[in-house]
Amino acid sequence: MPKVKDTSASSKALNVIIYAVMVFSLLICIIPFIYMVSLSLSSPKAIINNQVRLIPKGINFEAYKQIFTYPNFFRAYGNTIFYAIAGTFIALCMTILFAYPLSKTYLKGQKILMKMVIFSMYFAGGLIPNYLLISSLHLTGTRFAMLIPFAINQFNLIIMVNFFKALPQEIEEAALIDGIGYFSILPRIILPLSTAAIATVGLYYAVFFWNDWFNGLIYLNTKQYPVMLFLRNIVNGTMVLGDSSSASTDTSTLSISIKSAVIITSTLPIIVLYPFLQKYFVKGLTVGSVKG
């Protein structure tokens, strides 16, 4: 009996430590975000006097007004929504269609293909060769430059391959016995069992396409810019918002508010999306890492 009590006591102590670490990690992540929200909603006077903490002082929506009233803001936001949705859909289709045959060990050349995938993870072509390739395909200046070249990510591909490997082979054999054709197994049997991995990989792709601004800077014209590139130009001061005749002090403090509002505006959609996919996220990662 004493040993049971000691085990129980040590288990409780361990749980307390784990919860304390988790709460501390949560605070590290959430406090800066709350502070950014507070800065974006505070008045210039409160910012000048360094009165802003976690609660806004002198509620002021001028920063958001400056961003939302800019002529090209909603066009850029619409571009990003298109890139995120279309890019994620195309990437998932390409990744699944490549990962499923790679998960079959009886496929001729399967090991060579996997080695090529892993090799390309560590030794990429580089910026200039990629630009020359995309330019030779006449994709520069088109929205496809943000979608087609990034349709498959090696890390996401490996997750899907390992997930498909973890599925029992007997399921496919039973489906064939029941009369389901080879071309129907993937959409009718495998994909319904792979929602966790698809949601995980889909979230990775969505975050990538949502945050991608560098490729837009290289390949797109101004009207096709994603919102991240639009907001980056605001933060860097290459795009002027508001009345240029305003006082310098107000301009500097408003700039702080605008930069904070930019952070909130750009990250909020992903933060809102994540809780809906959280239940699939951990499962998809753990199951996708069972086999190598």
State where each predicted segment sits.
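A hydrophobic, multi-pass inner-membrane permease signature
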Residues: 2-292
